[in-house]
From Swiss-Prot:
Quaternary structure note: Homodimer.
Cofactor binding: number and manner: Binds 1 [4Fe-4S] cluster. The cluster is coordinated with 3 cysteines and an exchangeable S-adenosyl-L-methionine. Binds 1 [2Fe-2S] cluster. The cluster is coordinated with 3 cysteines and 1 arginine.
CDD domains for this protein: Radical_SAM
Cofactor(s) annotated in UniProt: [4Fe-4S] cluster; [2Fe-2S] cluster
Gene giving rise to this polypeptide: bioB
Domain of life: Bacteria
Organism: Alteromonas mediterranea (strain DSM 17117 / CIP 110805 / LMG 28347 / Deep ecotype)
Binding site for [4Fe-4S] cluster: C64, C68, C71
Radical SAM core domain sequence ranges: 49-276
Keywords: 2Fe-2S, 4Fe-4S, Biotin biosynthesis, Iron, Iron-sulfur, Metal-binding, S-adenosyl-L-methionine, Transferase
Enzyme Commission number(s) from the entry: 2.8.1.6
Gene Ontology biological-process annotations: biotin biosynthetic process
Reported function: Catalyzes the conversion of dethiobiotin (DTB) to biotin by the insertion of a sulfur atom into dethiobiotin via a radical-based mechanism.
Catalysed reactions, as listed in the record: (4R,5S)-dethiobiotin + (sulfur carrier)-SH + 2 reduced [2Fe-2S]-[ferredoxin] + 2 S-adenosyl-L-methionine = (sulfur carrier)-H + biotin + 2 5'-deoxyadenosine + 2 L-methionine + 2 oxidized [2Fe-2S]-[ferredoxin]
Full protein name: Biotin synthase
């Protein structure tokens, strides 16, 4: 008998009214209790044995005018990074094809800009169209966006736009001075208004306090609509940046941040993002237990190191994790299909001695997907 997780049709109400005191209380929970609660939430909305996989490519590297203290791409710091012009569309398409071949379902493109210039937009839009034509989900991070730029990206086929809040409003001024917190929130509003999915998270380990981490998650969870994707980054210290000698964050604190994010944002994909190169397999496994269900494939994230794809494949094999496939139907339809599947399996289980419902092979969902494809 194969034992698998037993999902439930019960859902958790999405809250946009979290207080910092509530979130600090979550951070203060005993570690095992916190992870247990995060797992309960996670299993009500996701298959815990599936992870969404993206690939991230730097399409324009270095010479950024911003002063983000963690970033090796800032022109203000001597990090030895060679600046590069906007990548040719043909090279971007080739990298997207390679990403699809190794199992990525989303291709993310990042440019070290304060904001895209009008002269660059035609090339950017063409990149989106070409990558989208490969059957991949598309994501970009280009800095701040105007409403018109967001609409143009949406019309070109962009699915996700990444713009992180980075840290709490209280600590933000210690990390960045060249753009305001409000600037970031305005860009997220422009992305939402254009009808794109929001990808927004932050970085931990920059010298912030637990209260700062709680405050950052409050900002994300209390947005008018919670981000569809929430990357949680561990600071990668780069020589030459102002944060290259900051004290290391305790790994358990990072895992706690993943777990609290999962509890607060039940339907969001929580991405185990930058910093994985320094994590052993056991720590990454605990992050997945805490509710992380998205990673980047590939040996580099923009300019910093990332585990080799082969290493990730082997880790997934050890943990029994499969890569999540792109859904061809809406979230609402999928929820209905899932509930029907659960009810069907519960009826079947009443006449058997199985202790677990096997929901790893959703027959009803598969039928609907085949019908959609037909």
């Amino acid at each position: 008998m194969t034992l698998a997780y037993a999902p439930t049709a019960q859902t958790i109400t999405i809250r946009n009214d979290w207080t910092k005191a509530e979130v600090e209380a979550l951070f203060a929970m005993p570690f095992n209790d916190l992870l247990f609660n995060a797992q309960v939430v996670h299993r009500q909305h996701f298959n815990p044995n599936e992870v969404q996989v993206s690939t991230l490519l730097s399409i324009k590297t270095g010479a950024c005018p911003e002063d983000c203290k963690y970033c090796p791409q800032s022109a203000r710091y001597d990090t030895g990074l060679e600046k590069e012009r906007l990548l040719e569309i043909e090279k971007v398409i080739q990298r997207a094809k390679e990403a699809k071949q190794v199992g990525s379902t989303r291709f993310c493109m990042g440019a070290a800009w304060r904001n895209p210039r009008d002269r660059d937009m035609p090339y950017i839009l063409k990149m989106v169209e070409e990558v989208k034509s490969l059957g991949l989900e598309t994501c970009m991070t280009l800095g701040m966006l105007t409403r018109d730029q967001a609409v143009a990206l949406k019309q070109a086929g962009l699915d996700y736009y990444n713009h992180n809040l980075d840290t709490s409003p209280e600590y933000y001024g210690d990390i960045i001075t060249t753009r305001t917190y409000e600037d970031r929130l305005n860009t997220l509003e422009n992305v939402r208004a254009a009808g794109m999915n929001v990808c927004s998270g932050g970085i931990v380990g920059m010298g912030e306090t637990v209260s700062d981490r709680a405050s950052m998650l409050v900002q994300l969870a209390n947005l008018p609509e919670q981000p569809q994707s929430v990357p949680i980054n561990m600071l990668v210290k780069v020589k030459g940046t102002p944060l290259d000698s900051v004290e290391d964050l305790d790994y358990f604190e990072f895992i706690r941040t993943i777990a609290v994010a999962r509890i607060m944002m039940p339907k969001s994909h929580v991405r185990l993002s930058a910093g994985r190169e320094a994590m052993n397999e056991q720590m990454q496994a605990m992050c997945f237990m805490a509710g992380a269900n998205s990673i980047f494939y590939g040996c580099k994230l923009l300019t910093t190191s990332n585990p080799d794809t082969h290493e990730d494949v082997m880790l997934f094999k050890k943990l029994g994790i499969n890569t999540e496939r792109t859904r061809d139907y809406s979230d609402e339809a999928h929820q209905q299909v899932l509930e029907e599947e659960i009810a069907q399996q519960q009826e079947q289980a009443e006449g058997s001695n199985d202790l677990f419902i096997d929901a790893t092979k959703p027959k009803v969902a598969a039928k609907q997907q085949h019908a959609t494809e037909a």
